[in-house]
């Protein structure tokens, strides 16, 4: 058995869950077990590195589900600069 941590957000709430899985469990199985439905535009990572849904999880992995950005960081900087100039 392996133990992993899954981190994801719903609205403005961060969820952190630890679960035990069988050795050789892929990401998509872990999500199915936790009944987490991800959208097509969500990315999945382990410790900040993107992985596929078929990636095999290892003991003590931190599985992260990333939300899509609401605004491009470059556009956000432009908006902040424009506000300061006014």
From Swiss-Prot:
Query: SUPFAM superfamilies per the record?
Result: MoaD/ThiS
Fetch the InterPro entries from UniProt.
Mopterin_synth/thiamin_S_b, RnfH, RnfH_sf
Q: Which domain of life is it from?
A: Bacteria
Pfam families attached here?
Ub-RnfH
Q: Which family does it belong to?
A: Belongs to the UPF0125 (RnfH) family.
Which named protein is this? Answer: UPF0125 protein bbp_234
Q: Which organism is it from?
A: Buchnera aphidicola subsp. Baizongia pistaciae (strain Bp)
């Amino acid at each position: 058995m392996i133990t992993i941590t899954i981190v994801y957000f719903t609205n403005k709430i961060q969820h952190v869950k630890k679960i035990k899985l069988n050795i050789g469990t892929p990401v998509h199985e872990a999500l199915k077990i936790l009944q987490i439905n991800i959208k097509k535009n969500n990315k999945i990572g382990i410790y900040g590195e993107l992985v596929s849904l078929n990636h095999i999880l290892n003991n003590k992995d931190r599985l992260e589900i990333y939300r899509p950005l609401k605004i491009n960081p470059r556009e956000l900087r432009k908006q902040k600069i424009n506000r300061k100039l006014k």
